[in-house]
Regions:
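Catalytic domains of cell-wall/extracellular-matrix polysaccharide-remodeling enzymes
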Residues: 1-63
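Terminal accessory/targeting
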Residues: 57-177
Length: 177
């Protein structure tokens, strides 16, 4: 890429990429992976051994997200121990997409798993041992949305977030505020 070549010629060797507005699709994550870069979205969560290096989470630490208690919780969080799903976040027909999570340990107790998204608390259904389906209470709004899931572990939390993007009904992209 021209930008990468220009940085290399200037003596920089980039190793990380931040997705603008945290937006990505699977084709873009594959490009980031093929370039040997770590990719960072804007989905919340901790990085763990099963994290996708082309789509790593990062926490917001500004505005309403910067309080001391929230900061401490985020620093102490753990990655949700799941096999990370390869999901294209662009929603087109199904405006209430289900998120399937497969836990690394099928014996994990998912009864304390809590997920939030558009419309508040989400419905969690056990599909099989160690596999849950999460569905929103309402359709995703136009723009960016996230499903955020936490599972307590002592005084800490396992955390995972999934981005979704929905275009306008005419197929055009939403405008930034």
């Amino acid at each position: 890429t021209d930008a990468s070549d220009a940085l290399t010629e200037a003596g920089f060797s980039p190793t990380r990429f931040a997705y603008p507005y945290g937006e990505y699709d699977l084709a873009l994550t594959e490009i980031i992976r093929s370039l040997g870069l770590q990719g960072f979205g804007q989905q919340s969560g901790a990085i763990g051994p099963m994290s996708n290096p082309a789509l790593l989470p990062r926490y917001p630490l500004a505005g309403v997200y910067v309080g001391e208690s929230a900061f401490r919780d985020k620093l102490r969080s753990l990655a949700l121990p799941i096999k990370h799903p390869d999901i294209d976040p662009l929603v087109s027909e199904n405006l209430k997409p289900a998120l399937l999570l497969d836990f690394v340990n099928p014996n994990v107790n998912t009864s304390r798993l809590t997920c939030y998204g558009p419309g508040g608390v989400m419905q969690i259904s056990e599909e099989a041992r160690g596999r849950v389906s999460i569905t929103p209470a309402s359709e995703l709004p136009i723009g960016r949305s996230r499903y955020n899931c936490t599972l307590p572990k002592g005084n800490r939390y396992h955390w995972f977030s999934q981005l979704w993007m929905r275009k306008k009904t005419d197929g055009s992209w939403y405008q930034e505020p």
